Curated annotation (Swiss-Prot):
It catalyses: a fatty acyl-[ACP] + phosphate = an acyl phosphate + holo-[ACP]. This is Phosphate acyltransferase. InterPro entries: FA_synthesis, Phospholipid_synth_PlsX-like. Keywords: Cytoplasm, Lipid biosynthesis, Lipid metabolism, Phospholipid biosynthesis, Phospholipid metabolism, Transferase. It is found in: Cytoplasm. Its EC number is 2.3.1.274. GO terms for cellular component: cytoplasm. GO terms for molecular function: phosphate:acyl-[acyl carrier protein] acyltransferase activity. Pathway: Lipid metabolism; phospholipid metabolism. Homodimer. Probably interacts with PlsY. It comes from Pseudomonas fluorescens (strain ATCC BAA-477 / NRRL B-23932 / Pf-5). Catalyzes the reversible formation of acyl-phosphate (acyl-PO(4)) from acyl-[acyl-carrier-protein] (acyl-ACP). This enzyme utilizes acyl-ACP as fatty acyl donor, but not acyl-CoA. It comes from the Bacteria. HAMAP family: PlsX.
Amino acid sequence: MSAQVIAIDAMGGDFGPRSIVQASIACLSATPSLHLTLVGQPSLLEELISGQTAVDRARLTITPASEVITMDEKPSQALRGKPDSSMRVALELLRDEKVQACVSAGNTGALMALSRYVLKTLPGIDRPAMVAAIPTQRGYCQLLDLGANVDCSAEHLLQFAVMGSVAAETLGIVRPRVALLNIGTEDIKGNQQVKLAASLLQQARGLNYIGFVEGDGLYRGEADVVVCDGFVGNILLKSSEGLATMIAARIEALFRQNLLSRAVGALALPLMRRLQADLAPARHNGASFLGLQGIVVKSHGSAGVQGFQSAIQRALIEIQEDLPRRLHGRLEDLLL
């Protein structure tokens, strides 16, 4: 297998580079064909690497960057004021084809602005969209947009639908069912942009559009791809993660109430751990920026070691599936 090379914005995220370095080294151990370059402050990164054991330095390099984009920094400031930020340098490595993907846990708005500026979008795409896999009763659903585009036109939603369909195809889904997230399934429901988007999706060649889906239908697995604007998608994603965490905590508390519940809990522990692992936000961490001329994966800023590993794994899959090239080909068929 040929090598996969990924640039890691090692300075992004809420907790600094420690967990990012640990996750990177863990991924190297698990994937012999993987090569990583950590982008950031060399002295700090070397110190963190030296504290780890069994590090294959032939597959782990450091690219220096003197500046860091903070989580509360405005995208315009990040774009114009920090030309040597770790985020920008990582994206420039991707643009210059020195790596095949970029992963960052940094400021979402800054990452989107820099990605569009440095990499540019694919022909036929006005705005990239963030997509992630959401667990459902039937498996997983690709949900987009997750916050990159708060206000969207009907044409943007059409572009998101096409990109989400291609992303689902790379995961082995044949003729993915595409739906628009709405407050009802009837044609009369929804705002004007959603209604206009429905008309466009119905006319799109080669797109398996099945109509509107409500929030509960998403979790029942009624669609493989669910499309919405970034305002709605981000709220849905964060609410889902919070709900999953709350349910797990409530069940754990119930099993600790008395001796009988503790005994029942001990019997149910293997199943509960499996369910908790399936629903854990860390397992599903990593939202792809679809529509760029390159692979960019956004990790949660609050992700720990396991969560950041998941983001790197998502980038690996997209490299192996050659997602930008496949996406470009499908966009030519459906949009151009």
